[in-house]
């Protein structure tokens, strides 16, 4: 994958989002608050097809003012399994003045591994996109994805 082949994030007001995206956000909130509820039941409550829910559920995240004070997020990196790879990633994060909350490196399979990092960016003014781009340009990192943000 090309280092420039990544998704950029935007902050968008809810009133300009398509109805299906807004419904997806509401369904995610309902499912979060009531784990016993099935996806089928939740989408039925909001009159949304399951296919529309699945299309948007991993691409839309609620954000509010709390992100300014918290600045915690989790990334997953897809990397080649080479000696020193994790050290290179950690060095990059140190140079960006980020605090590492948790690290998990998967067992390498077929020369590939994933590194999941929970980070705290309160000590830097960098945006998440800047952090992701800095990690994308590290040799042997093929993909970087944002998987969660603490709000």
Curated annotation (Swiss-Prot):
Domain of life: Bacteria
Domain ACT: 74-149
InterPro entries: ACT-like_dom_sf (IPR045865), ACT_dom (IPR002912), UPF0735_ACT_dom-cont (IPR008310)
Similarity remark: Belongs to the UPF0735 family.
Protein name per its UniProtKB record: UPF0735 ACT domain-containing protein SSP1116
The organism of origin for this protein: Staphylococcus saprophyticus subsp. saprophyticus (strain ATCC 15305 / DSM 20229 / NCIMB 8711 / NCTC 7292 / S-41)
């Amino acid at each position: 994958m090309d280092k420039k082949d990544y998704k950029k994030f935007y902050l968008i007001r809810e009133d300009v989002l398509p109805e299906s995206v807004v419904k997806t956000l509401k369904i995610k909130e309902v499912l979060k608050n009531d784990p016993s509820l099935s996806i089928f039941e939740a989408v039925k409550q909001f009159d949304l097809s399951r296919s529309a829910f699945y299309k948007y559920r991993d691409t839309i995240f609620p954000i509010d003012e709390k992100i300014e004070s918290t600045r915690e997020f989790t990334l997953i990196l897809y990397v080649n399994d080479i000696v020193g790879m994790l050290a290179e990633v950690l060095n990059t994060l140190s140079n960006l003045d980020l605090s590492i909350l948790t690290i998990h490196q998967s067992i390498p399979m077929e020369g590939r591994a994933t590194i999941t990092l929970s980070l705290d960016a309160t000590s830097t003014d960098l945006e998440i996109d800047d952090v992701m781009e800095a990690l994308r340009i590290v040799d042997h990192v093929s993909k970087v994805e944002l998987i969660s943000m603490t709000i």
